[in-house]
């Protein structure tokens, strides 16, 4: 890919202007931020700060593919967070949820569940929640 340029960036300080990025994906990163496992500083709100930064740079009508562990909300010491479905939805009020899919705990039995429900997500211990959000046209953030 001759036009590909790879850069290093800090998810807490992305090098993009406000509302300038049309498409973002953040897959299995947020749950680790602020827990110190990968050399980052301990910050109990690190994940929320990173989410705020993703929201800052995503353009109107922009798409965000956001993947995190889903189940009963908790922090696994020095490893990762597990989020409830409702937690993730509450973090993105200025976005429309276009699709939610799930790789459940029993993925060998159930496989990939496209258009999974909140109820199925709530039954997981450590499912893989795949959210497709789209920023609404106008908001007050």
Protein language model annotation of sequence segments:
Residues 1-14:
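Class I SAM-dependent methyltransferase SAM/SAH-binding core
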Residues 45, 66, 71-91:
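Acceptor-substrate binding/catalytic loop of class I
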Residues 85-138:
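Class I S-adenosyl-L-methionine
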Residues 25, 30, 34:
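A conserved beta-strand element that flanks and buttresses the S-adenosyl-L-methionine
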Residues 42-63:
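A short glycine-rich, Lys/Arg-flanked "PGG" loop and its adjoining helix->strand segment in the class I
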Residues 12-24:
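A short acidic, Gly/Pro-enriched loop at the edge of an enzyme's catalytic core
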